[in-house]
Amino acid sequence: MAEAGSGFLEQLKSCIVWSWTYLWTVWFFLVLFLVYILRVPLRINDNLSTVSMFLNTLTPKFYVALTGTSSLISGLILIFEWWYFRKYGTSFIEQVSVSHLRPLLGGVDNNSSNNSNSSNGDSDSNRQSVSECKVWRNPLNLFRGAEYNRYTWVTGREPLTYYDMNLSAQDHQTFFTCDSDHLRPADAIMQKAWRERNPQARISAAHEALEINEIRSRVEVPLIASSTIWEIKLLPKCATAYILLAEEEATTIAEAEKLFKQALKAGDGCYRRSQQLQHHGSQYEAQHRRDTNVLVYIKRRLAMCARRLGRTREAVKMMRDLMKEFPLLSMFNIHENLLEALLELQAYADVQAVLAKYDDISLPKSATICYTAALLKARAVSDKFSPEAASRRGLSTAEMNAVEAIHRAVEFNPHVPKYLLEMKSLILPPEHILKRGDSEAIAYAFFHLAHWKRVEGALNLLHCTWEGTFRMIPYPLEKGHLFYPYPICTETADRELLPSFHEVSVYPKKELPFFILFTAGLCSFTAMLALLTHQFPELMGVFAKAFLSTLFAPLNFVMEKVESILPSSLWHQLTRI
């Protein structure tokens, strides 16, 4: 019985919702008809005549004040709507209408009735949204002391945001520290240094950690009863201190490379010792994991130093050896460094081999993967590609493959072509990127623009075909073609990662909400009316009367027809019934 009663109530509620949704026009005409029937007892004609007499007695100054006040109010609403749209990306009036008025009218019933069936799909989409909005470490990030700080000295601008540097500090604490650091004085100092916000304080702490390691401990070893000898024993060097100095204090890449080589000696020794002791307990295992991260980081940065200094083949060899030695550490994305170095060597066959391994459906994509694949496909046809010839004879199979690869890359990250085609100026890439966002596009184009320019006709092919991607995905936030729908969170995250002097690229381009345009038009129209009424009161009065008479002419015509059809004694007959 309870189920039957609840089912009846749900059916009744759905009928009411349906009537509100589709029959509001019928209800509106019924109300008008009822008002017409009750016009005599309600004395509507007398009230209207009283109102018209009151309006006729008003002076033009009243209308000027009225229109001026309306213009002021609509202008304030416009300013508030524009501010809310710039900050939150949506209209305040639309949000209030959807959030509060729509539930009152039953607009969410259809979704709530299917909640139990779609809970799994919602959780999957939420997980996908979280993974797409994850911030990643930039595998091609620059050196703070040798590159970012030099930019600041020259331009006076800060290329890194506080949010970006805070993420780097968290990464350093994750990779370079462990729970047993308090047992070694140098590591304890570095544990505090990674949390320090002031760069000079971090550098001073790194020097302090190295000075502690210079202390020599003496161990007394008795050789004979009458004499003793003192053995000098050096404490192990602190590799993370050298890392910090190489990253932040070194002003050139050559200086950074020297410090990283010293860090490599210290880090390699710590790694070998912890490798032998890793099975003795969880504490030793954590130390070995930390030492592994330190060693991989040092070798990767040494390879990047070699790449910066022009020793590209040496850098490629170091990266290949590192990937073979530590194949499971994919968090550093060393293959992206390798792809960039191989493109510099123009070793396109090796690039294709790396792509065959990492451009897999089960692995996370990146702009480097997608656009490098598109570059290789474009390289095969770009030197002979002509848009006029292609429009006459159609695209060949190779050209079609190249265009599809470009469309795939543009769908993954639609911000990259503007930087590759130099439609937008580049800045220094941040230390962290958001995949499919503007930050990733900057990081990719900063290092790969030269590789696209080196391939003859590649940028021309990109220029002719990249905008065609958007015709395939008219609603990118709702449905994608080859990838998941474009995440909504990219603009907010990119504004946190990129400096304020950079204009963040937004996709899809947001159109102004209807209510902003409406309030802008209303504000302008009422202000114009106020000005005209103040300047030409008599003429505007004549115009207003003519406008109102024209506006109400159809209604008066309908009322006359209704009065001619219905008998004059209808209300009297209805009261008798």
From Swiss-Prot:
The modification Phosphoserine is found at residue 386. GO terms for cellular component: membrane. Glycans are attached at residue 47. It comes from the Eukaryota. The chain crosses the membrane at residues 15-35, 62-82, 512-532, 539-559. The keyword Cell division does not apply. Keywords: Glycoprotein, Membrane, Phosphoprotein, Transmembrane, Transmembrane helix. InterPro entries: ST7 (IPR007311). It is a multi-pass membrane protein. It is found in: Membrane. PANTHER family: SUPPRESSION OF TUMORIGENICITY 7, SUPPRESSOR OF TUMORIGENICITY 7 PROTEIN. Belongs to the ST7 family. This is Suppressor of tumorigenicity 7 protein. It comes from Rattus norvegicus.
